[in-house]
Amino acid sequence: MGFRRRLAAITVGKTSSRSSTPSDPAVAGLHDSTDALLGWTEAPAQASCTWIGNGVDHLGRLLERLVDLLRHLEATTSSWWTERLLNEFLILADAHECFGDVLQSLKQLIIEAQAALRHHDTARLAAAGHARRGCDRAFSCLASILRAFLPHSCSSIEATSNRSEAMLAEAVAATTCAAAAASVVIFTGIASFLATSALRALTSSMASYPVKAMERLRSLEECVMAVEDGCEQVRRALVSARMSLLNVLSGDESAGLFKHYTCCI
C-alpha cells in the first residue's frame, strides 16, 4: 500500500496546489472527479476483484468527463499545452490497449484451465499455470512503463497570463496525472489478484478437487470480464480525448475526422 500512497502524494500535491477555485463548474467538476479517483487508490489494504473493477469504472467516468469538457473548447484555444497532453494521452491509450490484449489472453487461459479440469488433464493444468506467469510479467511491465511516465505526466504546466485557460490546462493536466497514477495501481492490482488466484495453484494436485477449483476459476473469469468491460470504456474515452485535443490543435479542419473516428470505435 506504500506505493499507492506515494502515487496519491504526487498527484494530490499537484491538485491541492491549484491557485484558486475554478469558476467554471465543468473544470471544478473535473477536479472533484480527479480527487475521487485518487481517493480510490488509497482505499483497500489488499487488491480485490471488486476494488479493481471500481477503479476502472472511476477512471472511465473521469476520462468521459474530460472528453465532454474538451469537446466544448473553442477551436481558437491556444495549443501551448494541448500538444504535450496529446502525447501523454497516446502513451496512456497504448498502455490500456496492451492491457486489454493481456486480459484477452488471460480469458483464454482461464477457458483452457477449465477445460483441463473437466477432462482431468494434469498436463494442461500445469501448462496453464506456467502461462499465467506470462500474464503476470505483462501486467508488471505495463505498470513499470507508466510508473516511469508518471513523473513527466505530473510535472507542472507552463504558466500563462490567461487565467481561465490556465485553470483549464491545470485541470486537464491533473486529470492526466491521476489517470496515469490510477492505471499503474490497476495494472499492479490485477497482477497481485492474479498471483493469489486459482491459476497460481493450478498443479496436478488440484485435479483432485475439480469442483472447488472450477468455482475459483469462474470467480476469476467474472473478475476479468468485469474489468474488461471497464477497460473498453477507458480505451474509448482515451481515444476520444486525443481526438478532441486534435480538434483544439487543428480547428475545423480536424472536426470531420473526429466525428468519423468516434463513430467507428
What spans do the regions from the language model cover?
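Long, contiguous alpha-helical bundle segments
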Residues: 1-265
